[in-house]
Amino acid sequence: LPFSLHQGDALRVLADLPDDCVDSVITDPPYNSGGRTAKERTSRTARQKYTSADAGHSLPDFTGENMDQRSYGFWLTQIMTEAQRLTKVGGTALLFTDWRQLGITTDAIQAAGWLWRGVLAWHKPQARPQRGRFTQNCEFIIWASNGPIDASRNPVYLPGLYSASQPSGKKRRHITQKPVEVMRELVQICPPDGTVLDFCAGSGSTGVAALLEGRDFIGVEKTRHYTEIAADRLTETLRDTLGQEDCTLAA
């Protein structure tokens, strides 16, 4: 199969994977930032911080969302060091974050040995306006490479700004789910027929995008409920892509 999905702690799972097995790391780690104060950021659950009214239904919580900024930076450095070992020379990394964690995320990715390349923006057209303030309608994507990039391997021209709304209603399967249309553009940084790793896979949107764009996918998700959702979405995408007669899934 062109995808594998692992349920468990990302650091432990990545430790068992071989060197140089992926071309791109594209992931959306817990931001550990929602809330106006440090107390709110470390005491409230992910569901309390991030569930928006357009979700339309209750969504299960996820873990890893209650670190202070120093602890978050330490964890991110650890896991991105391990991810660099798995990434081929010239491979890339894309990490979602918000404005509060932008600095610590760029610090951590460089401390892990990656070459910081820049910041992309994801614009959310339906973000709620705030009276007397600027609308917080962007999240950010830090991108980096494992050493120099050989552009001849993947001669693409990709934009630095992406605009799409978060899925709403019953299409929202995860509290912080990213739009597949954005992820489909981002996975194109991975060479054709390459492999994308997402160690915070959530409901599997990165994997769905990778399969739709002809890339292989390795996903890791700690929460069992979301692992099951991701498995269903990846399997359905694979069947739609290959055709039912070409897809045989092991139990």
Residue ranges of each PLM-predicted region?
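S-adenosyl-L-methionine-dependent nucleic acid methyltransferase catalytic domains
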Residues: 1-126, 132, 136, 143, ...
